[in-house]
Amino acid sequence: MRLKIVRASGEETLHEITPSIEYAFELYAKKGFYRAFSEDMKMSDVYWLAWECLRKDGVTVPTFGATFIDTLAKVEVVGEDDNPNS
């Protein structure tokens, strides 16, 4: 599973959801990663994953919340076979 993140500036990046990001998500959300995305998917969870991916990649981001979300134009969950440029 990967995230395609499009920032408000137009910058697009693609991020792998690594085991450490899954673990951080489960601590944050208090629910299992795969269950959250198969049965109870919320966009706020996707935005949190985008925040964590950017943060883990060394990008300086605001504290998670509305200020961070305002820096996003679009976030998509993409599979391994999906074309990230579509």
Which residues fall in each region the model found?
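Charged interaction scaffolds used for protein-protein
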Residues: 1-14, 19-86
